Amino acid sequence: MNKKYFKKYSSILIFSMSILAPMTLASCSYNLAKEKDKDQKESTNLSEPNKSNTSKTNTFQDKKDSTNKIDSQESSKTQSQNTSESNQNTKVDSSKTNNLATNQNNPSKSNVNIQETNETKQEQNINPNNAVISEKQAENDKNASSLNSKQINNTLKNQDKTKQENDQFKQESKDSSNFTSPKPITHDPINKVISSQSTTRLEMPKNDQSNSESEDNKKSPESPKWWEKLNQGDAF
């Protein structure tokens, strides 16, 4: 019985070992490959920061070099400008000395020479900003002059128009005054109003005349009649 169990269990063990052995070998090889990959990655990660640091240092150095070059160029420009200004100042000083020497001999020309030196200084000190400002000022002056000319033309036109209207009004008033105006109204002695334009004398109608004559004869036979008084007033 023991031999049977031993053979049986031994066969099982051999079978299990035959299965487990390659699995263990495969897992071991897989783990070894993982470790190798990790080592390679770590080595690459360590090498890459060094590369980035070197590139950063190189770019920083290049920037420094470029800034230093720019600074050196600007300093050289400023030095050249300073030398040119000093040369101009020396020229101005020499012109001043020459002008002083000539002014001592010719005092009448001293003011002219001083003005010329001042004008040269002003021309030398003018910068582009001043040139732009002067151009803007010139444009503003042109615009102002054009506006003033327009206003002057408008005022002249208005004056001419008003003058023409006044002349026309005066002419119309003269023409109206030349027409015959009505004569003033006069009063007769009996307070009867008649117009001076009418030259015809008043005449009573025939029927009314007879009645008025009879009434006047009754009142005062010797007194003149009222229409005769009217005619006498017109005569005066």
UniProtKB/Swiss-Prot annotation:
GO terms for cellular component: plasma membrane. Residues 35-112, 134-236 are annotated as: Disordered. Keywords: Cell membrane, Lipoprotein, Membrane, Palmitate, Signal. Residues 43-60, 75-112, 143-157, 193-212 have a biased composition (Polar residues). Its main location: membrane. A lipid is attached at C28 (S-diacylglycerol cysteine). It is a lipid-anchor. Residues 1-27 form the signal peptide. A lipid is attached at C28 (N-palmitoyl cysteine). Residues 61-74, 158-175, 215-228 have a biased composition (Basic and acidic residues). It is found in: Cell membrane. Belongs to the M.pulmonis LipAB lipoprotein family. This is Lipoprotein B.
